[in-house]
Amino acid sequence: MPQFRSNENPMFRSKFSEDIFKHKYAHHGCETWDALAFTLVDDVCQDHLSKDDKDELKRMITDLKFIPGGRYLYYAGRDNKFFNNCYLLKAEEDTREDWADISWKSESCLMTGGGIGVDYSVYREEGRILQGTGGLASGPIPKMQMINEIGRRVMQGGSRRSAIYASLNWKHADVDKFLASKNWYDMPIGETGFSIGQVKEQDFNFVAPLDMTNISVNYDTEWLLNYWKTGDTGDVFRTNVRQALRSAEPGFSFNFFDKEKETLRNACTEVTSEDDSDVCNLGSVNMGRIDDLKEFADVIELATKFLLCGTLRAKLPYDKVYKTREKNRRL
């Protein structure tokens, strides 16, 4: 098979990678990868870095040694500067107001093109009496489904699917329902004789519960100490393992001792936090393009400078995210 080489973008090693760039990231003024790299560095770094640093960053990005997160690439040179890929949200109070607020925060974040993760553990279980308004609580799972449907309708730029993560503590009274909440093959569609899972095999876009959402169970210090004491992981964990082996979900979120409150995750779960409205700030170093340890160190240093500039330049969806970014300033 002849080796692929593009005249416009010679740094790409396959037509597939160039097609992704053209479909997702190329836009006016950034029609080629090197043009995007130059525009992006000038847009993000402005006067915060020296000309030499910016020139070297442009070369590193052009050569695919350092690749900023996808939102950096998408918003390079655009009027809005939503450079952050994801946001970490927390249901903070078991109240009607917080229930509504988490929807507003989720939609505000998703409309920038960033993904979200939400810990719903504070919400009361299904069926508990509501003293203030009367009736019975619906529990956290319907709220997860509401956020899932917001994500279904928020297609940033008309082409980007929302990325969503949801978690629940292992002691929550609704955890058994949560564990089975994506068992689509156990969910019949009326009298058709088919399950949601069977139909979704044929039509990827067929609507299914939490189909836009990755889910995980949170395990805390109490769970760990009980395991150390008794050697028993407990029914919830065993069911979680069976589910994960069967369908890959739910996953596992382990938060112990001084990190016990860091239950928040972004949609891809590489960032952890205990602070509501936290934000991730992503870039990747492509070691396959780097020749030696010295070059690796140089790339890391300039990539760090670039991402720090991003924390000064990036626009955010609402005020609390600015405050949390100022506190944590994550890279």
Q: Which sequence ranges carry the predicted segments?
A:
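Extended catalytic cores of very large enzyme megasubunits
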Residues: 1-331
